[in-house]
């Protein structure tokens, strides 16, 4: 599977579906979620909350609202908003997002840094966990993962793990 690293906004990449590193309640109050909700509309959060609770290690698909994508995958890295995350939760969330994207037969999924914002997971730890899960995954439909973040340190961490730096 092709892995590409991009510095920029997840809302502007060319992908079929984007991932929101969520909480189990589906509330979109911090980090990447705020941007997705602001640009895509309240209906994204409404639908995620209706599908809650979303345990860490699972994921749900909602509308992308006004965004150009076919949907938003909400993959919790924490149970409650602003709760600390962990390397294991980042792994579970990444795996759950990939599994759902593949099950829905999307070709390209964009994933931001998982658990690195309010979750507090060090970027290098999250980058390694995410890349290892992506490399282990055996897709049926999924062809490409775009790792995208506005944070230069996150981008550098992915590039380092992938041997691009």
UniProtKB/Swiss-Prot annotation:
PROSITE patterns: MACRO (PS51154)
SMART domains noted in UniProt: A1pp
Xref: Pfam families: Macro
Alphabetical list of Gene3D superfamilies matching this protein: Leucine Aminopeptidase, subunit E, domain 1
Annotated ranges, domain Macro: 1-165
Annotated PANTHER family: GANGLIOSIDE INDUCED DIFFERENTIATION ASSOCIATED PROTEIN 2-RELATED (PTHR11106), MACRO DOMAIN-CONTAINING PROTEIN (PTHR11106:SF111)
The protein's name: Uncharacterized protein aq_987
Organism field: Aquifex aeolicus (strain VF5)
Lineage: Bacteria, Pseudomonadati, Aquificota, Aquificia, Aquificales
């Amino acid at each position: 599977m092709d892995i590409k690293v991009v510095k920029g906004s997840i809302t502007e990449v060319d992908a079929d579906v984007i991932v929101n590193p969520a909480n189990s309640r589906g509330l979109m109050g911090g980090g990447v979620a705020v941007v997705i909700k602001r640009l895509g509309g309240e209906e994204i959060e409404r639908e995620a909350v209706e599908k809650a609770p979303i345990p860490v290690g699972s994921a749900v698909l909602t509308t992308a609202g006004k965004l150009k994508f076919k949907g938003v995958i909400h993959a919790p890295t924490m149970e409650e908003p602003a709760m600390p995350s962990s390397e294991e939760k980042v792994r579970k969330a990444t795996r759950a997002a990939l599994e759902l994207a593949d099950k829905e037969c999307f070709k390209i999924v964009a994933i931001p840094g998982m658990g690195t914002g309010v979750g507090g997971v060090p970027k290098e730890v999250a980058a390694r966990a995410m890349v290892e899960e992506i490399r282990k995954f055996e897709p049926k439909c999924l062809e490409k993962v775009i790792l995208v973040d506005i944070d230069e340190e996150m981008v550098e961490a992915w590039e380092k793990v992938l041997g691009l730096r």
